[in-house]
Amino acid sequence: MNDDKTERPVKTANQRGAARLAAVQALYQMDVGGTGVLEIVAEYEAHRLGQEIDGATYLKADAGWFRSIVSGVVRDQVRLDPLIAVALQDDWALSRLDSTVRAILRAGVFELLDRKDVPVAVIVTEYVEIARAFFDDDEPKLVNAVLDRIAKQVRGEAKK
C-alpha cells in the first residue's frame, strides 16, 4: 500500500474559476469596506489565493486572471454599471442590489466586454455558479438573466 499522495495539477479552467470567485469576494470587500484596488489585490495574492485560512484552503487561482478582473472592474465601472442598470427590471436600481450580487454582475459584465476569447456560456455559467454559492433564492436567476441580456447586447449572442 502506498501512502504517497500525488497532487494532481489544478486545471487552468479551475484556476480561472477560483480567480473569478476570489475577484467577486475582493470586489465585495472593496464595496463594503472601502479598500483600494492595489491593497486588495496585494492582500489576496499574498494571503488568500491558494492559501489556508482558518482551516479552509482557498483554491489555487490564476493570479493574473484575478488581477485582470478586479482592476478591470474598478477601471471600467462607469461603463459597466449603466449596462447592468439597463438590463435590470424597470423598478430595480443597481444600488438596491445586494453588494455580492453587484460584485458578481460587475465581474461578469467586465468579462463579457473584455474577454472576447472566453465563450459567453462559460462566463454566464461561472458567475451563476458563484451566485449559487452565496444564494439559494432568486439571485442566481437574476445573475443569469442580466448577464444573458448583456451578452446579447454586447456580443450579439446569448448563453447556448
Swiss-Prot record:
The keyword RNA-binding applies. InterPro entries: NusB-like_sf (IPR035926), NusB_fam (IPR011605), NusB_RsmB_TIM44 (IPR006027). Keywords: RNA-binding, Transcription, Transcription antitermination, Transcription regulation. GO terms for molecular function: RNA binding. SUPFAM superfamilies: NusB-like. It comes from the Bacteria. GO terms for cellular component: cytosol. GO terms for biological process: DNA-templated transcription termination; transcription antitermination. The keyword Transmembrane helix does not apply. Pfam families: NusB. NCBIfam families: nusB. Belongs to the NusB family. Involved in transcription antitermination. Required for transcription of ribosomal RNA (rRNA) genes. Binds specifically to the boxA antiterminator sequence of the ribosomal RNA (rrn) operons. This is Transcription antitermination protein NusB. It comes from Rhizobium etli (strain ATCC 51251 / DSM 11541 / JCM 21823 / NBRC 15573 / CFN 42). The gene is nusB.
